[in-house]
UniProtKB/Swiss-Prot annotation:
Record GO biological process: translation
GO cellular component terms listed in the entry, alphabetical order: ribonucleoprotein complex; ribosome
Organism: Wigglesworthia glossinidia brevipalpis
Keywords: Ribonucleoprotein, Ribosomal protein, RNA-binding, rRNA-binding
Organism ancestry: Bacteria, Pseudomonadati, Pseudomonadota, Gammaproteobacteria, Enterobacterales
Protein name, as recorded: Large ribosomal subunit protein uL23
Family, per entry: Belongs to the universal ribosomal protein uL23 family.
Record keyword Ribonucleoprotein present: yes
InterPro entries given in the database record: Nucleotide-bd_a/b_plait_sf, Ribosomal_uL23-like, Ribosomal_uL23/eL15/eS24_sf
Amino acid sequence: MINKKENIFKILTSSYSSEKSSILSEKNNTFTFKVLKNSKKSEIKSSIEKFFNVKVKKVRTVMLKGKSKKHKNIIGKRKNWKKAYVVLKKNQKINLIKNIE
């Protein structure tokens, strides 16, 4: 479990963008993040509320297996990772892409 004084950036590794996640963000106010494998839903919820200053309605997590990759005769494997779907309450928004002028 992450201590309160530790940085919230340790739980949220990055935002995740795909066709499915963009559709969910437009229709259901759901955002997708890559998180630490051992993080809990309550930790994810509190870190997003503190970092983005929004109210979270629900958090769903999925554990994804790393893909097997082959380069010439060497077979390798990517790391397993955890994805979190974060549903925000009504009238709450996260601006992941800031305008660059």
